[in-house]
Amino acid sequence: MKSRVVVGLLLLVAACTGDGETGGGTDGPVGSDPGSTEATISGSPATAGESGDMTCWTAPPGGGESAISFSDQTEAMGLVTPLVGMYGHAAVWGDFTGDHRPDLFMGTFADREPSIYQVRGADGAAPDRLLLSAEGGFTLDDRLADMFARTSGGAVADLDNDGDLDLVVSRNFDDDMPAAPGVQVLRNDDGGLTATTESGLPVQLGGRSVGVLDFDLDGLLDLFVTSDDGGSVLLRNEGGLVFADATAAAGLPGDIFGLGVATGDVSGDGLQDIFVAGSNRLFVSNGPGSFTAADSSVFTWQFFGEEDLISGASIADVNRDGLLDIAVGHHFNSTVDEGASVPVRLYLNRGDNGFEDVTEAAGLVGLPTKGPHVELNDMDNDGWPDLVTTASAADGTRPAIFHHQGLNGDVPTFSAPEGLGNPQYWVAGPSADVDRDGRLDLFLVEFDPSLPSLLMRNETSSGHWLEVAVGPEHGFGIGWRVEVHEPGGALIGAREITVTQGYSAGVAPIAHFGLGELQEVDVRLVAPGGEPIDLPSVPADQHLRYPAGCP
């Protein structure tokens, strides 16, 4: 099934030298033909002495199981006791302390009867928590003021351009908890988070997931907050951590029902677009500051019950054509209540011909439980992004991950995980390389307070890898497009640096790529509305931050 969306691939025609300054030479267009993946990046490698050493850390490919596998490191990393008494819902990775390790914020629904929380040693409902990361594990940050609310989602971003990551949280506003606003920014002060006041953010919003983008290209990061009351909002950053509702002014309707959100340039004009999971509507940028609703009929789902909802979304290129594709997860109660089997869905970006639902052709079988959270990430670093879900496999003990097996024509094919059938699922499962071994780990958010949320260490046998980040002088690169190519040749992967993945979850602003057997790649960076920056001959197996590493 196809639906026409005006999608033209961005012609990346300007060349840059390896030190990030614009040069006089020119490269051929990258991705100008959606059917071609041949592209050449030329110039001098970016090395120490030119742009400075951009390498933050390195790690060789890891050994382990050939199948995607995990070990439970929750207790070993100190994440059991601090998270008791929680109806977990929101989880956000981000480096708040500036030590280049991912810290963890977890939000909870604290509005139930106290007795419900009194399990696993908890005295009652816990507030939202911030866990700070160190090499040996996590410690509870007691500087975070207690907040008891229905915290549903969140994301990190440098919202005041002071060089560190702030936190924005969204909540289902509850009249019984008037102190907890629907959207709130917590300013980062020396690694501690402090709630802002007089921010102009909506107080009574039924907030869910949070998207971050600079939709008007004014250098200030804006917010798109989904709402399950049909009033999702676009919030323009006015500076000074003050925001204004720009929904109508940007051409967006006021009735957008949403649970999840994904931002990314699917139209190829160099500007970020917005996909809202829930009502499954795509809004395409038609220039800085405004959007047009695209024909979104291809994203229509069949429902089996009143409590069936569409939840998370993820955007990345899954077939190496340079176009960003969309995966969508579900929160279908009919799977656990009525025995329905419902797949997460995959939509290929067909350029000017719109999107095509390739779920069945890709081998994405129905799930017997909810799969709210989805991510397109390469979990074994073989060069192909896998489809991560928070449905369970392995008899309910591991996340269900569909392993990318390569292309059938231009359609990706996935193998289903073993052990599907258990009703266990997790609300969210944001990824991060917690132990710096080049493999993405997962934090699985548990809604039931009688069970723990889980930190799952990736122990899969790994190919080569590369992580690309951008420094605070460029807003941590949120919205930047990152491409990796074989040296002088074909496209291996393309994605944008985003801080929103899946459902109710946030990730650090890092683009992760598996490289398979490649030990060196060419990298191309493009800021929204900007010119390409070429970094040829980049060694694999490193975390790289442009332009000056991790001081």
Name each model feature, range by range.
Residues 104-108, 167-171, 223-227, 274-278, ...:
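Hydrophobic beta-strand segments that make up the repeating blades of beta-propeller
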Residues 56-73, 113-141, 177-196, 231-246, ...:
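Beta-propeller blade repeat segments, especially FG-GAP/WD-type strand-to-loop junctions
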Residues 77-113:
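Beta-strand-rich domains and repeat architectures in extracellular enzymes and scaffolds
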Residues 197-235, 245-247, 253-283, 295-297, ...:
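Solenoidal tandem-repeat scaffolds enriched in leucines and small polar residues
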Residues 77, 81, 291, 410-551:
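Gly/Ser/Thr/Pro-enriched helix-cap/hinge segments flanking short amphipathic alpha-helices
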Residues 94-97, 101, 134, 157-164, ...:
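Calcium-coordinating acidic loop motifs
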